[in-house]
Amino acid sequence: MGGLVPLGDDIKQMVLDNYAAGQSWIDLSTYDDENGNEQFNAIFFRTNVKSLVWYSPDNFEDNGYEVPSSMEELMALTEQMASDGNTPWCIGLGSGAATGWPATDWMEDIMLRTHSPDVYDMWVSNEMPFNDPRVLEAMDFFGSIALNDSYVNGGSKAVATTDFRDAPNGLFTSPAECMMHRQASFIPAFFPEGVEAGVDYDFFYFPAFAGKDLGTPVLGA
């Protein structure tokens, strides 16, 4: 205790004036000091929303696809795309020594859509092991996409070897190598030069299950 220096009211006001939902960011950065008094200790300079699916509006329109509003609809759309001869997903887990982290994001998003936040917290704090049936259920769901050769650009063997920075390129080829790419809000930095937001690409929320009463969770970092 006592290791953090409070930032003071001027910085707090700056956050309130300039950050969307400023009070929520202040709340996340406020902790009790050694005397039990609440202190504002930090500002967020970068955050990413991870529960996003990127796609080409033209590809959707040309094929008659609509943005899904539930996970059930997303999986039905995935199957429809494959039946139409299109590849639904581009997935790339490659990241040098950090290879695999995009799968973690998939797993976290799925856990938040299949179980309560309390279960998710138990998992990420290691109170619940990775071989817990609830975690295995999420792995099986991810595997139903990533291990299906008809669902992934390059087939399942390409998932681990495709670099995450290159994975979304399939959205922009002609013909498209994939229809959708689940990745965080930072990924447009790796899109091909010259593509335009809202024209060449757009995104939708990685949806929740309509059949589960778990709200609309959003994963961030």
Which residues does each PLM region occupy?
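Extracytoplasmic "Venus flytrap"/periplasmic binding protein-like
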Residues: M1-S24, D58-S69, G170-F172, M179-M180, ...
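Hinge/lid segment of periplasmic solute-binding proteins
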Residues: G2-L52, P102
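Extracytoplasmic/periplasmic solute-binding protein
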Residues: D32-T47, S51, M75-M128
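Extracytoplasmic/periplasmic substrate-recognition and gating elements
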Residues: E38, D62, E193-A221
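Short helix-initiation/N-cap motifs at beta->coil->alpha
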Residues: M71-M75, S156-G170
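Glycine-centered hinge/linker elements that transmit conformational signals in sensory
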Residues: T78-Q80, V124-A160, F206
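Alpha-to-beta junction loops
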Residues: G85-P88, S174-Q183
